[in-house]
Amino acid sequence: MKKILFVAMQNSPHTIRWILQAQSEEWEVHLFPISQYPLHPDMPSWVKVHHPWKIARASFGSGFLTSPIVTGNILLAYLSSLFNFRQRIPILSSLMLFLVDSFRSSLGVAGNTSPIAYGPFVLSQLIKNLKPDLIQSLEFQHAGYCVYAARGLIDAKLFPKWMGTVWGSDILYYRNIPNHLVQIKQLLSSLDIFSCECKRDIDFARELGFTGVFSPVMPDAGSVDISNLKQWRDLIVPSKRRIILIRGYQSFSGRALTALDALEICQERLHGYRILVYSASNEVKQRVKELSLSTSIDIHILSHITPYAMLRLFARARLFIGISVSDGISRSMIEAMAMGAFPIQTDTSCCEEWIIDGVNGYSVPVDDIEVISEKIQSALANNAMVDNASRMNLALIDERLNNETLTRRALEFYRASLGLC
């Protein structure tokens, strides 16, 4: 039977959604995690996960670092030789992550590293023993770089077909950093298949030297099940909703503080609306506190909200605001559109592949607070635009992101890549 080996962030919901699209009786699905952290709770049981060791817990709360028998499908010949451990070495559970993370491998000229136990050498041993027919790395700067480094440890004639999948800012942002640009070019020149969620990344890949096969453009975060969401979506007409949701990332790419500054400018127009900020960084939390004390804005931080609760909030929101210097298809924007919230998203994502500016959303510059504020006020004033956008976006999401369509396209491409059709 054919084998697909995913190299990916094992705790990411994006990984889960992608792998679910690859389920088939025609091949086995394997996963090499890129770190020592736990699997996402929704990881399918039919995925064979290749950890370099297994962690077992004793009844009294301590843990054990268990050395597997080194066979054709287990990875630890290297670590066994380093640490010379036998069957079980007791170790405090609280120290496990620290110890594993302390020994790191280089992933190349960009300067990224990985835990040595989940690094290129161990991955190369798995590839040699498992002999997958296709490797798919989900994301470039960790998973992709790790596969590229492992590739250098294996005879090129024995290395399997490799599909590299771009996430979010993998090329758009990192191509502006010299060392990353070098490594992105190296990676692209080694790929057989390039996978992305934004059409713009196809052009970037060509410009940077990719000459292989392009997979169908598909969202990294998977499908949206409209049929199960309508029960929440249709409870309140968008123009009657009184919640504004803001994605609270302030990071190398997130710019939630810019969104908050734009709200402060139009605070008089926000009377009667509640502003909710989710996934807030520490500086964003501080800024929200300042706005709450110094202005009339009714603004709050959302903490520890589940994905389903988030969807229900989108169904009660009039506006969604996502500001970032770099992104792919924002999952938050997609979910907002699916639930009827009017999206205001920066043009540094590929939102323009989804939004007709001023029709079913607004595409705004990341650094122009005045423009962002004007678009917020416009979306609050124009009830007809918001309601019409809701209907248009529902049809758009259902057309592009329904599970049946995406799964069929994914399976057809996997079959072709594995030589099954």
Question: Where do the protein language model's features map onto the residues?
Answer:
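A short, well-ordered alpha-helix in the C-terminal region of glycosyltransferases
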Residues: 371, 378, 385-400, 406-412, ...
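Short alpha-helical donor nucleotide-sugar binding micro-motif in glycosyltransferases
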Residues: 312-317
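Conserved donor-binding/catalytic core segment of Leloir-type glycosyltransferases
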Residues: 195, 222, 233-267, 276-278
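Nucleotide-activated donor-binding/catalytic signature segment of Leloir-type glycosyltransferases, i.e.
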Residues: 286-305
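Short hydrophobic beta-strand element within catalytic cores of glycosyltransferases
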Residues: 341-345
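Aromatic "clamp/platform" in nucleotide-sugar-dependent glycosyltransferases that forms part
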Residues: 325
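Short acidic/histidine- and often glycine-rich active-site loop of Leloir-type glycosyltransferases
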Residues: 348-358, 362-363
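Donor nucleotide-sugar binding/catalytic pocket of nucleotide-sugar-dependent glycosyltransferases
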Residues: 164-167, 189-232, 238-239
